[in-house]
């Protein structure tokens, strides 16, 4: 691994950029908005630096770090996520006036940690990457110190996050104690040549508990609605997409290498299936009575975690491809939804409820249509991208014999239509209290158009995207 390649990796470039911006801000006192724009430029430059190495493959740092097509795909995903979160931060008016520049800069470290997780091949590096991400969110969630709800959310996230990290470390300790190594290859080799014993299974269970927190999977979901509601909306979006994806990219890595042996599979497949079943049931049913939009989307996120776990439980190539495709569909829909929420928060600083969407079509038709496409995609209705994501997950799970899981998942998806369509009904068929127009900047209009049209086109042309994901996995 030469020095130029190391510099061009997103985790290295973004970390160095963040350090430079922090020092520059401390010495030169740059305007906060200028810092935010520079952060957006950093994400674009990181994406450009990635291009020459897309086809590269290799294992580096004595087996700790892998560079393959799947790693590149997830790094691109995290760069897009970081870029969009930074734009949402610039658009949001609810941030604290003090230390706003740090609010723009710190996500660079978070994205670097997520990019590192895309390439992990060792449990120690896995823990380091997850802690970079988790500790960053401890700061972000409680950033709005003047709001009691933000402090409450921050404390809850800190306590449960620390507990999850403890389980993860304990699981890694069990795996190391039995196999004598933390490298994925060595653990897989040990499982092939030796019977999988009780302590090793216990280590696997502890690791799944730790990662279940990141995925907001039931029964490790209790923090999700409160933290989503209490955190600032850009950070809620980052938790819903980036943090969840970080947990799943690690699950994809460990379940398909160190724990791929049939001796492990007969234990983790039922556990993953149970978490998937509980998540789709609890997430969808708990979302129905919610009136706060962020809390509703928090429970919705739990249900989507269940559908993603359904793809993992299939333990086949189709299931892994379904998880990746589903995440891209989910990212597009969630960012469109939360961008609309941020725009509404300018007039509702205390929080946006479902009734605040009443007559949105009359106030700004682009916002209404963007939110409608987002809700329809999250609900899994054709022909949008979210429909094909759910269809792939169901097909993969059915093909692997998880028939009950698919039937329950389909019923829960149907139940979820109630709260998704409720938002659409409020925007188009409910009279508003006032018809005050909402004006948007040209950049925000463009982003809403891109997210809306992207969800439609990637639904109509899902086949080439699915083939691309399949080629990455091959």
Curated annotation (Swiss-Prot):
Q: Which residues form a coiled coil?
A: none
Q: How does it sit in the membrane?
A: Multi-pass membrane protein
Keyword Ribosomal protein in annotation? no
Catalytic activity field = a quinone + NADH + 5 H(+)(in) = a quinol + NAD(+) + 4 H(+)(out)
Question: Which regions span the lipid bilayer?
Answer: 4-24, 34-54, 70-90, 103-120, 123-143, 158-178, 200-220, 239-259, 268-288, 296-313, 323-343, 366-388, 404-424, 446-466
GO cellular component terms, alphabetically, are: plasma membrane
From which domain of life does this come?
Bacteria
Which BP terms does GO give this entry? ATP synthesis coupled electron transport
A molecular function annotated in GO for this UniProt entry is: NADH:ubiquinone reductase (non-electrogenic) activity
A Pfam family it matches: Proton_antipo_M
Q: Which Cys pairs does UniProt list as disulfide-bonded? A: none
Q: What is its main location?
A: membrane
Q: Which keywords describe this protein according to UniProt?
A: Cell inner membrane, Cell membrane, Membrane, NAD, Quinone, Translocase, Transmembrane, Transmembrane helix, Transport, Ubiquinone
Localization recorded for this chain is: Cell inner membrane
Enzyme Commission code: 7.1.1.-
Q: Where is the signal peptide?
A: none
Complex formation? NDH-1 is composed of 14 different subunits. Subunits NuoA, H, J, K, L, M, N constitute the membrane sector of the complex.
- Record family assignment: Belongs to the complex I subunit 2 family.
What role does this protein play? NDH-1 shuttles electrons from NADH, via FMN and iron-sulfur (Fe-S) centers, to quinones in the respiratory chain. The immediate electron acceptor for the enzyme in this species is believed to be ubiquinone. Couples the redox reaction to proton translocation (for every two electrons transferred, four hydrogen ions are translocated across the cytoplasmic membrane), and thus conserves the redox energy in a proton gradient.
Q: Which HAMAP family match?
A: NDH1_NuoN_1
What protein name does the entry list?
Answer: NADH-quinone oxidoreductase subunit N
UniProt organism field: Methylacidiphilum infernorum (isolate V4) (Methylokorus infernorum (strain V4))
> What would be the name of the gene that encodes this protein?
nuoN
